[in-house]
Amino acid sequence: MDLIRTVEGLREQGQLGPTAGAFGAPDEVLLLSTGPASHLAKYSMIARPPRRRAVVRQPQPETSVLDQSNPLQAEPAWDTEGELTATVQAWSDGSWHDLQQVSAPTLDDLMRTLNDVMLDQQPFVTHVEGWPQRPFLSGAFAYDLVQWTQPIRVQHVPDFDALLAVFWSVDGALLIDHASGQSHRLHVNGDAWAEHVEPAEARVTLGPVVQHAALESSMDDAKHAEAIESVK
């Protein structure tokens, strides 16, 4: 199945992106597997338009203290950051609205909390091997989250309120099996998006252009010049 054509088709049908307001936000959550199909790159995922997300931003810095450490001389500064805070939002009336804030001392603790706060416990109607059986989180992370994943003090932190991560609640998706070319739908009972979404038709691929051999002239340059002179 042509993955890019499928994404384009969903957009054209109002099932994904800015035209999918009837189902959720314009955010597009795609997990793309490239390269040969294997157990490490078997599926690609196109999530249904999300209806809930959580945004994590760089907190206000504490009072700065001159750091005398020198990691290049085996003198790293060991430290633990404060609370990591996420703002849970819901899509409504054409925009994202803040619902609540949740905090945790580490990234994994925060994700467990978001799992309880954001996700519907209703199971998916269909089950696909290797995939969760109910809604799950998918996200995009900045490298600066190392402040909460490693016990080191970062000397040059991002600016206050810089975006660190976004977590989306995936309560429906179209899965594409690269080995078989088949598609599978993950959805909860009564999801109108899953009832209408249809994989796009295969893109027509033109065959290779046939290279014709160059035409050979029966007249060389000298004969061509003689012919011109004869006309004069």
What is each PLM-predicted segment?
Residues M1-S103, A140-K232:
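Extended accessory regions or peripheral subdomains of proteins
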Residues A104-T126, Q150-D161:
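Short acidic (Asp/Glu) patches
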Residues Q121-G130, E226-K232:
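A short acidic-Thr-Gly-centered motif at the start of a beta-strand
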Residues V128-F141:
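C-terminal interaction segments
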